[in-house]
Amino acid sequence: MAPYPCGCHILLLLFCCLAAARANLLNLNWLWFNNEDTSHAATTIPEPQGPLPVQPTADTTTHVTPRNGSTEPATAPGSPEPPSELLEDGQDTPTSAESPDAPEENIAGVGAEILNVAKGIRSFVQLWNDTVPTESLARAETLVLETPVGPLALAGPSSTPQENGTTLWPSRGIPSSPGAHTTEAGTLPAPTPSPPSLGRPWAPLTGPSVPPPSSGRASLSSLLGGAPPWGSLQDPDSQGLSPAAAAPSQQLQRPDVRLRTPLLHPLVMGSLGKHAAPSAFSSGLPGALSQVAVTTLTRDSGAWVSHVANSVGPGLANNSALLGADPEAPAGRCLPLPPSLPVCGHLGISRFWLPNHLHHESGEQVRAGARAWGGLLQTHCHPFLAWFFCLLLVPPCGSVPPPAPPPCCQFCEALQDACWSRLGGGRLPVACASLPTQEDGYCVLIGPAAERISEEVGLLQLLGDPPPQQVTQTDDPDVGLAYVFGPDANSGQVARYHFPSLFFRDFSLLFHIRPATEGPGVLFAITDSAQAMVLLGVKLSGVQDGHQDISLLYTEPGAGQTHTAASFRLPAFVGQWTHLALSVAGGFVALYVDCEEFQRMPLARSSRGLELEPGAGLFVAQAGGADPDKFQGVIAELKVRRDPQVSPMHCLDEEGDDSDGASGDSGSGLGDARELLREETGAALKPRLPAPPPVTTPPLAGGSSTEDSRSEEVEEQTTVASLGAQTLPGSDSVSTWDGSVRTPGGRVKEGGLKGQKGEPGVPGPPGRAGPPGSPCLPGPPGLPCPVSPLGPAGPALQTVPGPQGPPGPPGRDGTPGRDGEPGDPGEDGKPGDTGPQGFPGTPGDVGPKGDKGDPGVGERGPPGPQGPPGPPGPSFRHDKLTFIDMEGSGFGGDLEALRGPRGFPGPPGPPGVPGLPGEPGRFGVNSSDVPGPAGLPGVPGREGPPGFPGLPGPPGPPGREGPPGRTGQKGSLGEAGAPGHKGSKGAPGPAGARGESGLAGAPGPAGPPGPPGPPGPPGPGLPAGFDDMEGSGGPFWSTARSADGPQGPPGLPGLKGDPGVPGLPGAKGEVGADGVPGFPGLPGREGIAGPQGPKGDRGSRGEKGDPGKDGVGQPGLPGPPGPPGPVVYVSEQDGSVLSVPGPEGRPGFAGFPGPAGPKGNLGSKGERGSPGPKGEKGEPGSIFSPDGGALGPAQKGAKGEPGFRGPPGPYGRPGYKGEIGFPGRPGRPGMNGLKGEKGEPGDASLGFGMRGMPGPPGPPGPPGPPGTPVYDSNVFAESSRPGPPGLPGNQGPPGPKGAKGEVGPPGPPGQFPFDFLQLEAEMKGEKGDRGDAGQKGERGEPGGGGFFGSSLPGPPGPPGPPGPRGYPGIPGPKGESIRGQPGPPGPQGPPGIGYEGRQGPPGPPGPPGPPSFPGPHRQTISVPGPPGPPGPPGPPGTMGASSGVRLWATRQAMLGQVHEVPEGWLIFVAEQEELYVRVQNGFRKVQLEARTPLPRGTDNEVAALQPPVVQLHDSNPYPRREHPHPTARPWRADDILASPPRLPEPQPYPGAPHHSSYVHLRPARPTSPPAHSHRDFQPVLHLVALNSPLSGGMRGIRGADFQCFQQARAVGLAGTFRAFLSSRLQDLYSIVRRADRAAVPIVNLKDELLFPSWEALFSGSEGPLKPGARIFSFDGKDVLRHPTWPQKSVWHGSDPNGRRLTESYCETWRTEAPSATGQASSLLGGRLLGQSAASCHHAYIVLCIENSFMTASK
């Protein structure tokens, strides 16, 4: 409704009246209702007697007594006594008779009232300008609302507006907030404020001002963040208006506004201007209901408001926004709510205002008006229907005005749209046009927050659109669109996206399902956030004896497990389409089967509702982790409705309505989900467009508010009944439903298949008009009258005509007219002109679907008007829900249909049709047409310009003598006076204080030598290692302080110091008494010499002081060399100290075992050498002063005799393989030798035998050039016996012929553990042509250096004749070498050891191995095969293209050329000493062990991590993983052998060739090299650490187990690794398989022994580690040395016996809170199960244990 053009005049008048009413200066009853009883008005608002000062009202209190209390309320002024007709329901008490001359008195008093108003305005404005600060309003702009339940409070202006509030709607069951004090009598003193002003919201206010929103309609959503916008209403009493007992004790309380979460409110106030400062009054609903707030929106009404604001102050400007209905001081009464209206009492309304917004002035009129709403209120067709009803008939109020505003016209239209099918004639009992519009201002409408409130949630919303991939969509011939759920279906969502945090108290669940199996299954479930129990759900049991149960799962808050609230047993319906519905209302639950009530059972539940956590889950066809049973079958419909009533139209398929193709708000039903019908959901909350003028009778097939048409459904000889009509008081209409056709037996008659949609039929004839309605309805509109567009009462609701008497009692509602008979279907013809749109008619009974009609003929009609905006559709969030627990979450990983934000506002609708001009209005307050008296005096004008200065006035009389003045300030200093006479000599003064000591004098001449000084502190020890063996005079510093030795003889006197600079002369000091002997001071640094001073007197010599303690400072001057002191040996590892006292060096103790070097060949025992001659004494060393300067030569002590030889140390670990050197120069060619005879093969069955001494070298053959090296898998073999040479391979392809090189003589076997013969054979080029046999040549000259320089022999010569077959050797581990290109295929060998591998291609011919010596050694060996005949010698080939290794000096150089390196080649960067391997599309770094110093005798070995080699044989499909022997030296010297004893290794299968030099690589799948490989036949369990430390928050034991599994797989470990942790459900001891606990050793990643068995670890001694034990991570890092683990502690959560400690495992390893603790052990203490509770925020080592030894998987 557009504002009236002439409303400004009355607005100005009301503005003045409002200000006066604010100051209690004026009674405005005459303005609003000229027929009001003045006796009531006199007690309500006292009239002023002249201008009265405005008094603050904060000190006036109103004692409000609970309604059931016995104490009468002590009512303050402004709180009238309620009339008797409302105190007792059902008894009509006659109202006070009005005096017949009341109108005349009213007219006569207008002039006096106006004069009083004018005077009051002047006083009030002046007082307001002087007392109200501008910033007081700004502080009152922020709204703080109480949630979830709180009273509706109005904050009125007082001396402290922020501290004042009057409770309007008291809440029930809320604890008293601070500041609310209850007396012994049960009353609560509360301040009585004045009515609220514009800027003061109707709730307690705190904080700074909020900038106003820019839209015309505002809500709290713009201010209060993104909390879920939900307002939940309690269902009204099922009996409607039946009398109810008084509400329980209620107290008016001040709301607690602290620590609350504000809500977005669904009901807001309309606003006119562009700038609206939102404010709200909140409703505290009883019980556990959520809050529904009505938000008042103030606005800027135009320039005149700002003008008044500038004139009278901000408070008055704010008051101007509420003009229109003048909510602050209307004439009326605030009365207690009668018990006959429990529907409003449930909303928290305890008092209401009369007259209401329908101008009812008595309780009887209110009850009569409420009868027309009785049936509609029971339908719950709109979520805010009860609010609309109560705001209209019983507007809530406090003890003082104003009442709550009326609902807006748009609110009314939204109700009419949602409830049209439940209305008789499609109309509400009130005309929406009679209510103010949103643009008019002071009214309540539905805000944006209500658009997300869903009264019904359907299947497609719960599944998402599109549904998850595991849920398939089908088109069933019986029901249409349906969804198939299999065993893998997953459809979890967050419940709070569809339901409020406080779930519906009463509700219904509707299903249309067809089970596919006889097993149990959950149809629907809402779980807690942990998915531990089902809060609400429906479950089908398994079929037993032809029956199955349907259970309602309803778990009360605080319960520990899922509770079955009710269970119904019915015949099994597997494979049958069945309608099921559960209705939960109050204390009962009812089951409906195929639309008939099957059984009703009591439901025991508390008054508390279901609180849904933020992470609560919502599932369809399952219950997530709370229940493993999943429903398997087809679901066509699933609805969760807030309405507990289950009607046939909800239960049955709406087959006749093709436009209703969806179930729920967003649809999941049988038609197009995009078309939504809102007739049942009540969710079409957006206001519709203004409807055209109604016709007399609605058509039979009308249009929905969101659909263009409904299909025609006509059944012959059937009367169309009103859908959902209820029997209203005083009417005879019968409640009927038109759901489906029923047979005489009462069963539902199933219809046939759906046909196609027919064309709309011809509208039937209009029905007969009904009898006239209530006389209270407004008449036709009149001409615009001077009325404000702001207010809800008075002319804004209904135009008040001229003088008329008070309205009589309302008549009874007329019975609705009968619906017209349905017309016969007309023949299809050309469509006629479009007629006026009629009201939607009631749907007829469901009839059979007709055939689709022919399309109409004719031109296309004009487009219809734009429809209202549709309901919000589901939005889809593409991010997946993340849940903490890794043990399995029922939430789906698919796109989830989560409700999205509100869309943009739609385009403005078309302008309405202008109304007819009304009759000229009359002045509404006089009884005649004569003009009224003069108006009020105007507001004071602006300040005029200053006048001319006046003439000076006459002098005034002399004033009285003033009070004495204050004492003056001190004057300034005067000038200096004349000098005085000389005084007499004074008495001698007292002795002065003793002066400070003078500066130190200059050093005197050198005195005689003094006695020897006291012994100094012990000097530092000597280091464990000496650079020169003869000793040095310089200082030595040890790594640890030695023990104090015996006192040595006194040292020589020190050198003479330099003379100092002369110091200033000082006064002679008095000789002091001898002081107490002090401790020797620390030597200080030499200071700057002062000037020479006078010589002081020599003091007496003090006594010798005690020896001082060790000081901290610069070292003193060293003394002269003394006799030889003790030589101290300090261990570099553990800091232990060994010393040998005595002047001369005696033979020392046995030294610590040195690091293990590589095991060499067995040499002959050498004789003990004699000690070398003693060297000459060196030059004396220098002596240094504290500042670093050299003072003089020092003397060197004599060297002691060499000590005895210590015992032999333990065997060291084998050394690392050396780097591959470059090929040496080819030797001089020799003569080809004669072919030797074939040797006899060795007998492999004899076991391992000793090999004989090597024979003389054979004649050299023609050497070939070295080719590309290949990988040698047996570089470090563990066996002590060499094997015979392998089988010769097939002849390789010929290579390019090279120049003939010189042949060098073969050198003796070297000491370096490398197979040079094999390497050379692998580096050969392609075989050349066969040469002629030559004579034996002379011995060639020695070669000029081998691979590693001239100190080593050159490479072996060409292969000689094969020798006799030796005994087979033990296969050694894989060694570090160069991975070459695959050679040509060799012949298939016999099966190897272990599981059969796949057959590989034949290898290249292998040369015989170099001679070896008997006994243990580290020479490379091969698994021998029977010797074959040697191939014919070829001509020398050219030099190979490459050795398979590329060297670069820097990493930058490597990055520039690495793309040129073939895949599989090794790359060495000299600058960083790093090794890389070229892989597909990049390169990978090879992890190396720590550097090992070269042992004596070798100078070319370097540590290298042995990369894995996977050998594939044609007959073995499983890869064989070789076991690298440990090659690192021990990290500390101890008595542990570097090579721990290994378990016995079985010998290989007889005759199995070991393809040690051939590697089959898979070029298509380059993988990262595993850090470990292990033999199949060795039973061990590995204990390995994760690659990075973890805090106590590991996402549970399953999260840690998963990381162990994942990282073990990444390095090629196929066993099952579990975290070395105790948890809530497992002890650490029980992780390893029972069969492997007693005898299987525990080793690290390098197979170094850690514990002899799993049980030995839990012997109660906290798992002591052996000295030198190492623990590696999966990527090969030593956790005790690597900086990745700064804290060397291990999580375990166990006691020493491996049992879990429930108080110390970081809350099942799920938290990293500093306050939580977990049991850990420090590895620095040498124990794996040490008992130390540490904070869970620390990042410690997490170990993984292989829980069983599985040979086949390793």
From Swiss-Prot:
Residues 1456-1501 are annotated as: Non-collagenous domain 1 association domain. Residues 456-644 form the Laminin G-like domain. Residues 1502-1571 are annotated as: Non-collagenous domain 1 hinge region. Residues 900-1021 are annotated as: Triple-helical region 3 (COL3). Residues 1045-1127 are annotated as: Triple-helical region 4 (COL4). Residues 1443-1754 are annotated as: Nonhelical region 11 (NC11). Keywords: Basement membrane, Cell adhesion, Collagen, Disulfide bond, Extracellular matrix, Glaucoma, Glycoprotein, Hydroxylation, Metal-binding, Phosphoprotein, Proteoglycan, Repeat, Secreted, Signal, Zinc. It comes from Homo sapiens (Human). Transmembrane segments: none annotated. Residues 1128-1141 are annotated as: Nonhelical region 5 (NC5). It is linked to Knobloch syndrome 1: A developmental disorder primarily characterized by typical eye abnormalities, including high myopia, cataracts, dislocated lens, vitreoretinal degeneration, and retinal detachment, with occipital skull defects, which can range from occipital encephalocele to occult cutis aplasia. Glaucoma, primary closed-angle: An autosomal dominant form of primary glaucoma, an ocular disease characterized by a marked increase of intraocular pressure causing damage to eye structures and function. GLCC is characterized by elevated intraocular pressure due to iridocorneal angle closure with retention of the aqueous humor in the anterior chamber. Iridocorneal angle changes are apparent in the fourth to fifth decade of life, and patients manifest age-related variation in the severity of glaucomatous damage. Its main location: secreted. Zn(2+) binds at H1572, H1574, H1582, D1647. InterPro entries: C-type_lectin-like/link_sf, Collagen, Collagen_superfamily, Collagen_XVIII_Fz, Collagenase_NC10/endostatin, ConA-like_dom_sf, CTDL_fold, DUF959_COL18_N. Residues 1313-1324 are annotated as: Nonhelical region 8 (NC8). Residues 796-875 are annotated as: Triple-helical region 2 (COL2). Residues 215-253, 833-846, 930-942, 976-1003, 1053-1065, 1141-1153 have a biased composition (Low complexity). One of its GO terms (biological process) is response to xenobiotic stimulus. Residues 42-104, 152-256, 645-1443, 1511-1556 are annotated as: Disordered. Residues 672-681, 815-831, 1095-1109, 1321-1341, 1519-1535 have a biased composition (Basic and acidic residues). Residues 1197-1269 are annotated as: Triple-helical region 6 (COL6). This is Collagen alpha-1(XVIII) chain. Residues 876-899 are annotated as: Nonhelical region 3 (NC3). Prolines at the third position of the tripeptide repeating unit (G-X-Y) of the triple-helical regions are hydroxylated. Circulating endostatins are found as sialoglycoprotein and asialoglycoprotein structures. Residues 1270-1279 are annotated as: Nonhelical region 7 (NC7).
